[in-house]
Amino acid sequence: FAELLFPDVTKTPEYYEEKYPYRKLPNKAEVTRLAPSPTGFIHLGNLYSALTDERLAHRNGGKFYLRIEDTDAKRTVEGAVDTVINVLRYFNIEFDEGAGYPDDDERNAYGPYYQTQRVDIYHVYAKSLVERGLAYPCFCTEEELEEVRKQQEEAKELTGYYGKYATCRNLSDEEIEANIKAGKPYVLRLRSQGSPDKEIVFVDEIKGEVKLPENIHDIVLLKKDGIPTYHFAHAIDDHLMRTTVVVRGGEWLASAPIHYELFHVLGFKMPKYAHTAHLMKFDEETGGKRKLSKRKDPELSLDYYRKDGYHPYTMKVYLMTLLNSNFEEWHEKFPDKDINEFPFSLDKMSTSGALFDKDKLHNICKNELSKLSEDELYDFLYDWAEENEPEKKNIWFADKEKMLGILRLYMGIGMKRRRKDFMYAKQIFEMIGYFFDMEDTQEKDEFRMDTEDVKTILNEYLSMYNHEDDNSEWFNKLKAIADKHGYASDMKAYKANPEAFKGNVSDIAEVIRIAVTGKANTPDLWSIVHVMGEAQMRDKIQKVLA
């Protein structure tokens, strides 16, 4: 009855084996893939997996491709594929082939890469299984299946369609033909060869040797509309696209017996599997670890990092520390080497769950951004502002030399040691916003002196200010203001007898600093004023005095 089920299928598995030959790749090269559902939501776990796949493939000249598992129409979101490609491209992860390339492009050689466009292929292999007695149509209704499930639960038996519960498994050819001609809807099921008292054994590339019970379920291969289930499509796609390593989350380990059986009944060589541990975070409420959650953790979404402007390289450095336990030591030893030179290995990946630590991410951001030149950081900030703050961009980047001067100042370029204040674009613009008169939209630090003392100091500062003064001359004038109002100009004298003074010259500088920047802590104040310009500085102080 294979012809009855698939009257329009004329091709054979051999046709596709010839159409998609084994790839000619260097020794030890791997073929990996990212295979998301087009839901429109791409998260940190996807980036974590994509980086794993990309590093595995490219360490020895292999291929990394994008496949879209879009068989669930209810979850498909328009534009989701472009989102996946563009978000990963932002993080400098590019696919060698796959979804997103034109049909006639050589990077589409093993396509199509959308599962909904591969239904004819799945039907060829489904027909072959039917011909060999390894698959059969099941006419059970949802109500009948639900009744079986209830019986199994009451009897405290394994739930599912197997053994004596697989009633359609034993239908005669005549019964099958009569049901089909009567127009009864059906799914196509695998006739499982598994035994409940046997195990499968395979070596997981991360977890090591794994033993699991054989699959005994007659799983659905094709749904009533002819669309394949994930399990069936996965096996055929990974075989024909010549995937050598499947990297996926640990939650898929329980499905390994199903995939193991499918690869064997289809006559395919099974790829290597690497089941990654979940990304975890410390839960302050419970004091323990938990999985990152879409509902609880906004930082799970990659849009979070794009919109706030995390530099893609800093994210990759951080994720590499989670992926391989020996990466940090290597990166400290070779700080100027491209991280793609790191000898990435699956056996250095965590088996218990990598702990996502935002503080550590920010420390890495500070360290990596401090290595950039002011021009590199300028270009990154410009691109981020163009996409995320187009109106403010025209203000921030109206004067390129001014912006470069600000970046040099905050990065400590020209100093003995680079400053490490910057973490991500949004935070950077908040930090330097006062240069563009944006401090009114930000929270300001409070003056620690009373209002009259603040006004007195600011008025005297303006009256004696000369923009031609060098740093030393400028600071001597601050000392003079300090002496006049009972503040120590000599720090040694202040430390020796602090009770003799109202404070010291740094308190005078703080008043001016807060008036000019809105912040008590900034880089060198004299340098700030000279990047800003005298007119803007005076205007800011006059606003405070008013």
PLM feature spans:
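Catalytic adenosine-cofactor/nucleotide-binding cores of aminoacyl-tRNA synthetases and other
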Residues: 266-448, 517-546
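N-terminal Rossmann-like or analogous alpha/beta NTP/dinucleotide-binding catalytic cores
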Residues: 1-154, 254-268, 314
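Charged substrate- and nucleic-acid-binding regions of tRNA-handling and nucleotidyl-transfer enzymes
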Residues: 479, 483-546
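Active-site cores that bind ATP or allylic diphosphates and position pyrophosphate for catalysis
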Residues: 128, 136-275, 280-292, 301, ...
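Glycine- and acidic
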Residues: 32-39, 65-70, 240-246, 299-301, ...
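Residue-level signal for inorganic ion chemistry
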Residues: 53, 84, 129, 133, ...
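A generic secondary-structure signal for well-formed alpha-helical elements
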Residues: 88-95, 130-137, 149, 156, ...
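Short amphipathic alpha-helical segments and their helix-coil junctions
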Residues: 29-33, 65, 298-299, 338-346, ...
